[in-house]
Curated annotation (Swiss-Prot):
Transmembrane segments: 8-28, 55-75, 161-181, 185-205
Pfam families: FliP
Main subcellular localisation: membrane
Intracellular or extracellular location(s): Cell membrane
Superkingdom of the source species: Bacteria
Any one GO biological process: protein secretion
Name of the protein this chain belongs to: Surface presentation of antigens protein SpaP
Family: Belongs to the FliP/MopC/SpaP family.
Length: 224
């Protein structure tokens, strides 16, 4: 019976793992930024979605490694077993403290407060003094409240970064369009000229490397 419970728990975790990686790590930001940069360059399928997602996944694993390592060390030291509910609950509360701190640090505080209050209202059925707590008083929010807050915060941050990255490429498109109009070449598509120019500039600046470094440096203090 114990082995059956362990197998069910393992299968359930394996099913949820892709969703946790996609929305509960920095993968969500990396993948969105990479796709937006590709679109800003005027390239539709180069690099492919698989390539961009693979690079985003590798960078995310590099960033999240300290947190995964701490959780694994706790798992080994405390001898957590899948057929013991109390052991799993303790692992979520204590073994994932590093991950909880990561989620708190990179989540919008207002979103954390919203989901925490919504969870408490759903649990108690009405507003209580606990629900009315100030956001600074929440010491240890639930991971289930932190995950949606973190995902939305990362999406918002990714779109901000994408906007700033889009601007110089839009300027190139506008300049090329103005030059073609001034030369009377209205029949020529500006994309035909602007795309090679944007590619040359991006490659000359080593854009993918600079972009990856900039994204990673935002998370380099998570192990401290």
């Amino acid at each position: 019976m114990g082995n059956d419970i362990s197998l069910i728990a393992l299968l359930a975790f394996s099913t949820l793992l892709p969703f946790i990686i996609a929305s509960g790590t920095c993968f969500v930001k990396f993948s969105i930024v990479f796709v937006m940069v590709r679109n800003a360059l005027g390239l539709q399928q180069i690099p492919s979605n698989m390539t961009l997602n693979s690079v985003a996944l590798l960078l995310s694993m590099f960033v999240m490694w300290p947190i995964m390592h701490d959780a694994y060390v706790y798992f080994e030291d405390e001898d957590v077993t899948f057929n013991d509910i109390s052991s799993l609950s303790k692992h979520v509360d204590e073994g994932l403290d590093g991950y909880r701190d990561y989620l708190i640090k990179y989540s919008d505080r207002e979103l954390v407060q919203f989901f925490e209050n919504a969870q408490l209202k759903r649990q108690y059925g009405e507003e209580t003094e606990t629900v009315k707590r100030d956001k600074d008083e929440i010491e240890k929010p639930s991971i289930f409240a932190l995950l949606p807050a973190y995902a939305l915060s990362e999406i918002k941050s990714a779109f901000k970064i994408g906007f700033y990255l889009y601007l110089p490429f839009v300027v190139v498109d506008l300049v090329v369009s103005s030059v073609l109009l001034a030369l009377g070449m209205m029949m020529m598509s500006p994309v035909t000229i602007s795309t090679p120019i944007k590619l040359v500039l991006f490659v000359a600046l080593d854009g993918w490397t600079l972009l990856s470094k900039g994204l990673i440096l935002q998370y380099m203090d998570i192990a401290t």
